[in-house]
A protein has these predicted regions:
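N-terminal lobe/hinge region of extracytoplasmic solute-binding protein
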Residues: 33-82, 113, 213
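Aromatic- and charge-enriched surface segment that lines or borders ligand/interaction sites
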Residues: 76-132, 171, 262, 309
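Extracytoplasmic/peripheral linker and loop segments enriched in polar/acidic and small residues
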Residues: 152, 329, 407-420, 426, ...
Length: 537
């Protein structure tokens, strides 16, 4: 997820400032800071801000234990056949949506069909691609988005691999075996939607996104107040795990420094990402309420393939070699992040140190030789989202690139993460793009397929390599986790040669909370544990 990820399998976004009377809420409610979500429809939510809000409104089929194994939550059981191609999901009885509708298997079928149908333009559509019939729900615009021709209607509107056997039984047939498929079902895009979400078959009801109806422990109070807040309140008689607080205000910020000021002043209860400029003072400001914990975040910059100045691999290698990762993590992040020299996070099985090799080693002399030989561009820019804590490290990175390559480099801030993604999706000349990734599910594949596979949900730079795609798919179809990892490691080795992105840093959660709350934890997905946080009496 993009960060963000979200991601989704989520791109990691970072938090940004909002104004709200709710921020001073007392009683048994808490205020948590986020940036403006890009979307709140589950199948279109692939970044961390939206995913956090949806985690309060929905209850997933699975969650994950301490060893990252999937554990049924809304599901009673998830069982594959002998081929790992047909999966049967039994639902726990008694769950309802916030409007009183019972949660049945057909709700999952309808939501997933909507998410998978190409013309609906859902950002998480890729995650349904392993289900039989997905290809027939897609169509290709013959002359691109800018051309006058329109894409033809897909061959089908519904996945052949989805079947509601009865109200509590969902049968999923995959297009190929996938031994770890159950892990995907914990991701945001696999939430169910009620009948009320649709005005007709497959057509989303107008206004539903601003007043989401979920199946989770909290329900929306009012509507999504864009650039201000989303307020949720606890559901009475919820059949799943019950939170300790009665409500949450997701307060939306455009500036993470303003968010931190609210935290220190006691107007905000949790900030999941302390801004860089406040790291040095956070211990004094917050005491033991300044905390760190592992997360799955991977920070990188990508080279858009639609910008021809980056087409020579030597240009990409040179820029990577011009960056002193250790200096930035020590001096800018004060050790809160660590240099990344691989393309996946250390928290997942299959991680290997230094798969990037020499391309990720600081070597300004070799970088200059490569760049000059490739006739790299005289000017570079790194575009980032200003609603996250990125300016300081982007400026530091540009200074290193200037010194090593002798070219001008500037950081360009977009006000919101959503604005950055929109510009990239429209193929505007953004230069190098600041991106981050929080795993959607704990598999090595989640750092490969969505980010680099052809048509991947967060492959914003447009990278495509047939051999890479085949290896990722071969890993999915492998009979054992060990065989899968071997294939995925081969795929990662291709990235190390072609450098479609530059690995920069591995994250950890660096968060803080107010005196009003306790039992605050932030997990590998960069989400606050909404079931354990509580108000201090």
């Amino acid at each position: 997820m993009a960060v963000g990820a979200t991601a989704i399998a989520l791109l990691a976004a970072g938090c940004g400032s909002g104004d709200s009377d709710e921020s001073s809420a007392t009683s048994n409610t808490v205020v948590i800071g986020i940036a403006e979500p890009q979307h709140l429809i589950p199948s279109n939510t692939t970044e961390t801000n939206g995913a956090e809000v949806l985690a309060s409104l929905f209850y997933p089929l699975v969650d994950f234990d301490a060893k990252n194994n999937p554990v049924p939550v809304a599901a009673e059981s998830i069982t594959p056949d002998k081929t790992n191609k047909v999966w049967t999901v039994k639902l726990k009885p008694g769950f309802t949506f916030h409007n009183g509708e019972p949660v049945i298997a057909q709700n999952y079928v309808d939501a997933w069909n909507y998410g998978a149908y190409g013309p609906n333009g859902q950002g998480g559509s890729y995650f349904f691609s392993s289900i039989a019939g997905f290809a027939d729900l897609q169509s290709e615009d013959p002359d691109g988005e800018e051309g006058p021709k329109t894409a033809p209607e897909p061959k089908a509107k519904k996945l052949t691999g989805l079947k509601a056997v009865d109200e509590t039984t969902l049968e999923i047939t995959l297009s190929a075996p996938f031994a770890s498929f159950a892990s995907l079902l914990g991701y945001t895009v696999f939430y169910p939607l009620p009948k009320a979400a649709f005005s007709s078959d497959g057509v989303l009801a107008e206004g539903f996104e601003d007043a989401i109806i979920g199946n989770g422990p909290f329900k929306m109070k009012g509507k999504w107040e864009h650039d201000a807040q989303v307020v949720v309140e606890k559901v009475a008689d919820f059949k799943g795990q019950v939170p300790k607080v009665d409500g949450i205000t997701w307060k939306i910020y455009q500036d993470d420094a303003a968010q931190y000021a609210d935290l220190v002043a006691g107007n905000l209860d949790v900030q999941t990402q302390i801004p860089l400029e406040s790291l040095a003072s956070a211990s004094a400001d917050l005491g033991d309420r300044f905390q760190k914990s592992p997360n799955s975040g991977f920070q990188f910059v990508g080279f858009p393939t639609f910008q021809k100045e980056f087409s020579d691999v030597r240009v990409r290698q040179a820029i990577s070699m011009a960056i002193n990762r250790k200096e930035i993590t020590d001096q800018v992040f004060l050790g809160a992040e660590t240099p990344a020299t691989s393309f996946v996070s250390p928290v997942v099985a299959g991680y290997r140190e230094n798969t990037c090799g020499a391309n990720c080693e600081y070597n300004p002399t070799e970088a200059k030789k490569l760049y000059d030989a490739a006739k790299g561009p005289a000017e570079l820019k790194i575009t980032y989202n200003a609603d996250g804590p990125h300016k300081a490290w982007v400026d530091a990175t540009c200074n290193q690139i200037k010194a090593a390559l002798g070219v001008n480099c500037t950081g360009v801030g977009e006000p919101k993460f959503a604005d950055l993604l929109t510009k990239v999706e429209k193929k505007q000349p953004v230069g190098l793009i600041r991106l981050g990734w929080i795993m959607d599910y704990p598999l090595m594949e989640n750092y490969l397929g969505p980010l680099y596979a052809t048509g991947g949900s967060s492959n914003y730079y447009g990278y495509s390599n047939t051999t890479f795609d085949e290896l990722v798919q071969a890993g999915r179809e492998a009979a054992t986790p060990e065989e899968a990892i071997a294939k995925w490691q081969q795929a990662e080795d291709i990235l190390a040669k072609e450098m479609p992105v530059i690995p920069l840093r591995n994250d950890q959660n660096v968060f803080g909370y107010s005196e009003k709350v306790s039992n605050v934890t932030v997990d590998l997905f960069q989400k606050v544990n909404l079931y354990e946080i509580e108000v201090v009496n």
